[in-house]
């Protein structure tokens, strides 16, 4: 037998050379049959022999890791319509297929195989990640509060638009309730830290796998930042917000929990002072301007770079935690719940909430829903002319915190430069009219 390169198709005639054949290490070969050389010359077209290559299946090419190629410009983040449900992060067919498998196993009486943290146990490798997220979250709040004393920030009182400059822009894209009276112009007021770091809160639960939060019992649970609640369930110990640490995994059959280790009552919380100097106040943005004074001009670039690095570390840490821990988000509003399933509080007032009796439409959450970036228009000069609507196609966007840190002297991460469109020269109004 002779090995033949896969380049052959059907029947291939080849003379056999007595010399050794060098085969390529990258190519694939198939087994073929050789006709003996004793065949008479009149019955064979070749003198030494004939090789037949049979049907060979095409081998699938091995997948290689794609190299990151930096693009010149990327599209601006889309604005999702409010009269439609958010798209599912996971394809709906895949969700249905997994549900059918779980239902089939439940009908056969087979328990669902759960890995940490889906079974209520901690993941030891993610505990340091959660600690780093909390530490960088505190540093992020402190640095941003100091930079807001230096960099001017404006927010629209009618919608959620934010602008980083000495004056507000003139782009008429306000979607507030009275935008028709102002012809789409924004109503600018002085911005706060909550306009840059959008507060996303969730209910703190002592046992995420315990009883669900009902509409009547919603006031028995505290509301804390969803990012902090995610870190607490990942292993961060905060005495004011205790969390149950299981030693035995829970057992599920389909969607039903058959063994959760019983219900435990939440222990009494230690009494803490409500002053702004308490350790718990460092996790919240309430009263940050009173806690942190304006920085000196020499420290501004250093604080800006530390704040930028903390922002990237927080986002990276939240991404790692959400790959393992379940976080649910409403498909219609901005409500977020950290836990294996959502709560039953009827406070959704968005699209078609009457049909759902105010209940939330839970689906898997994205990182931008737990830690929203809040994109703003990129301004190259804070003291320059305000942005106009007829030149908006030449403007870029960036997260509000990145824009503030950049104007304070921090280096812009590479992944934001394409969206900011730093390589585009913004023309004058008359030059823009002549552009084809």
From Swiss-Prot:
Induction per the UniProt record: Up-regulated during photomorphogenesis.
InterPro entries: APO_dom
Keywords of the record: Chloroplast, Plastid, Repeat, Transit peptide
Disruption phenotype: Plants fail to accumulate significant amounts of the outer antenna subunits of PSI and PSII and to form grana stacks. 2Fe-2S cluster-containing complexes appear to be unaffected.
Keyword Transferase: no
Pfam families attached to this UniProt entry: APO_RNA-bind (PF05634)
Gene Ontology molecular functions: RNA binding
Feature: transit peptide: 1-47
All copies of domain APO, residue ranges: 155-240, 329-414
Tissue expression pattern: Expressed at low level. Expressed at higher level in leaves. Expressed at lower level in roots, stems, siliques and flowers.
Cellular localization per UniProt: Plastid, Chloroplast
Coiled-coil stretches: none
One cellular-component annotation, GO: chloroplast
Function according to Swiss-Prot or TrEMBL: Involved in the stable assembly of several 4Fe-4S cluster-containing complexes of chloroplasts. May participate in 4Fe-4S cofactor incorporation into psaA and/or psaB during translation.
Domain notes: The APO repeats may provide ligands for 4Fe-4S centers.
Family designation: Belongs to the APO family.
Name this protein carries in UniProt: APO protein 1, chloroplastic
Source species: Arabidopsis thaliana (Mouse-ear cress)
């Amino acid at each position: 037998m002779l090995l033949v390169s896969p380049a052959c198709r059907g029947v291939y005639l080849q003379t056999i050379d007595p010399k050794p054949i060098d085969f390529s290490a990258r190519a694939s070969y198939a087994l073929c049959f050789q006709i003996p050389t004793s065949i008479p010359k009149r019955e064979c077209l070749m003198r030494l022999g004939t090789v037949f290559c049979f049907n060979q299946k095409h081998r699938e090419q091995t997948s290689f890791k794609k190299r990151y190629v930096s693009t010149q410009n990327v599209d601006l983040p889309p604005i999702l319509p409010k009269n439609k449900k958010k798209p599912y992060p996971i394809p709906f067919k895949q969700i249905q297929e997994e549900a059918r498998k779980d239902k089939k196993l439940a009908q056969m009486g087979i328990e669902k195989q759960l890995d940490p943290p889906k079974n209520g146990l901690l993941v030891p490798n993610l505990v340091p990640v959660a600690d780093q997220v909390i530490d960088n979250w505190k540093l992020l709040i402190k640095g941003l509060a100091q930079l807001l004393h230096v960099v001017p920030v404006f927010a629209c009182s009618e919608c959620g638009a934010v602008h980083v400059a000495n004056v507000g822009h003139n782009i008429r894209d306000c979607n507030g309730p009275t935008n028709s009276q102002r012809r789409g112009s924004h109503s600018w007021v002085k911005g706060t830290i909550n306009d840059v770091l959008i507060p996303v809160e969730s209910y703190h639960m002592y046992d995420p796998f315990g009883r669900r939060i009902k509409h009547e019992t919603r006031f028995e649970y505290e509301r804390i930042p969803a990012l902090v609640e995610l870190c607490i369930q990942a292993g961060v110990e905060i005495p004011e917000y205790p969390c149950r640490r299981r030693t035995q995994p829970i057992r599920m059959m389909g969607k039903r929990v058959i063994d959760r280790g019983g219900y435990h009552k939440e222990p009494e919380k230690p009494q803490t002072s409500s002053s702004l100097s308490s350790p718990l106040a460092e996790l919240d943005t309430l009263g940050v301007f009173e806690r942190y004074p304006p920085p000196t001009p020499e420290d501004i670039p250093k604080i800006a770079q530390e704040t930028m690095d903390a922002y990237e570390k927080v986002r990276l840490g939240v991404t790692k935690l959400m790959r393992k821990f379940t976080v649910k988000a409403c498909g219609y509003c901005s409500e977020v719940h950290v836990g294996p399933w959502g709560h039953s509080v009827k406070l959704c007032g968005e699209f078609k909430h009457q049909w759902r009796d105010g209940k939330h439409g839970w689906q898997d959450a994205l990182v931008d829903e737990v830690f929203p970036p809040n994109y703003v228009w990129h301004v190259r000069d804070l003291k320059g002319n305000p942005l106009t609507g007829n030149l908006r196609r030449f403007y870029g966007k960036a997260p509000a915190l990145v824009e503030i840190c950049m104007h304070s002297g921090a280096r812009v991460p590479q992944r934001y430069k394409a969206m900011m469109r730093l390589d585009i020269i913004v023309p004058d109004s008359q030059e823009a009219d002549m552009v084809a």
